[in-house]
Design a protein with these regions (language model features):
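ALDH superfamily catalytic-core signature
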Residues: 221-296
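A structured beta-alpha segment of the ubiquitous adenosine-cofactor-binding alpha/beta core
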Residues: 125-126, 194-212
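Terminal low-complexity tails and localization/encapsulation signals of metabolic enzymes
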Residues: 1-29, 62, 66, 115-139
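Conserved small-residue-rich beta-alpha loop and adjacent elements
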Residues: 114-189
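Glycine-rich loop-to-alpha-helix module at the N-terminal edge of alpha/beta enzyme cores
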Residues: 25-115
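Residue-level signal for inorganic ion chemistry
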Residues: 24, 60, 82, 105, ...
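Periplasmic-binding protein-like
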Residues: 154, 212-217
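Short beta->alpha connector loops at strand-helix junctions that form conserved
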Residues: 161, 166-168, 196, 217, ...
Length: 296
């Protein structure tokens, strides 16, 4: 685990083996964290939240920019590490777990620079004050872990929140590497914490009283369960669940290129992405041709 700016020995003694899906060889083992490990990480995040939340948007922007630079220097290492864990084609991993996270951290650095903690509407006699929520629990899947992680912790950090990250059990090493990068970039201890583990670890994050918000990407059934629990405690939840995206074919579409386009949109990452097209919508006037071309 990576907690409070350093590697920590977990309370849990259970380990999870990570296997390279391409070779079926053992890569490493990581802690299957329990509620005590989550509590340790959340306590560190809570302790860091006050000072981090009082930092200026410019200070947070500078650190996000530094993280982008640190990530960029090691992006190929990160891409190879993700591919070794989830089997993604390396060329794709270099985009989704290398170049894209770098761009995202730079984007959120710019968001932080433009952030205005307080605005005044003199006509309405109102003041709008934007304050960090506190500790955000982040739960991500294995298919594009670093893009998804950047899209979650980037805005949280920019807003002045601290985070407890629970990566997918299958892709744990890259999140630990990210935490190491963040420390080298200058993030204070406790701002970014990573607890590895499976379903029970994620459940502990959702149920932790020190966590003020949950950001989750994963399956629809898991999302329903998390939403129900967050509803009971009135914990804010941001959930990105399984999609049912459609490929829309218009009457003037070039059917000669349709099949290749469908493969690209329906089967990226062997179809293991939430936005993969699983439906085709076509006009009745060319429906038969679309079926014939799409099934070739």
């Amino acid at each position: 685990m990576f907690v409070d700016g350093d590697w920590r020995t977990a309370h849990s003694t259970t380990r999870i083996d990570l296997i390279d899906p391409a070779t079926e060889k053992w890569i490493a083992s990581v802690t299957d964290g329990d509620h005590r490990d989550v509590a340790m990480a959340a306590a560190a995040a809570r302790a860091a939240a006050s000072k981090w939340g009082r930092s200026t948007p410019a200070e947070r922007a500078d650190l996000l920019e530094a993280l982008a630079n640190a990530f960029e220097r090691r992006q190929d290492e990160m891409a190879c590490l993700v591919t070794a864990q989830n089997g993604s084609v390396l060329s794709r991993s270099r985009r989704t777990n290398g170049a894209r996270p770098v761009a995202l951290y730079r984007h959120y650095a710019n968001v932080a620079r433009a952030f205005r903690p307080e605005t005044t509407d003199t006509a309405a006699g109102a003041i709008v004050r934007r304050e960090p929520l506190g500790v955000v629990g982040v739960i991500i899947p294995w298919n594009a872990p670093q893009s998804l992680l950047a899209n979650k912790i980037g805005p949280a950090l920019a807003a002045g929140c601290t985070v407890v990250v629970k990566p997918a059990a299958e892709t744990s090493l890259d999140s630990l590497l990210l935490a190491e990068m963040a420390t080298s970039a200058g993030f204070p201890p406790g701002v970014i914490n990573v607890v590895t583990g499976g379903r029970e670890t994620g459940s502990a994050v959702v149920g932790c009283e020190e966590v003020d918000m949950i950001s989750f990407t994963g399956s629809t059934p898991a999302g329903r369960e998390i939403a129900a629990r967050c509803g009971q405690s009135l914990t804010p939840l941001l959930a990105e669940l399984g999609g049912k995206s459609a490929a829309v074919v218009l009457e003037d579409a070039d059917l000669d290129v349709l099949a290749a386009k469908l493969i690209a949109t329906c089967l990226p990452n062997t179809g293991q992405v939430c936005y993969a097209c699983t439906r085709i919508i076509a006009p009745r006037t060319c429906f038969g041709d679309v079926v014939d071309e799409g099934c070739c």
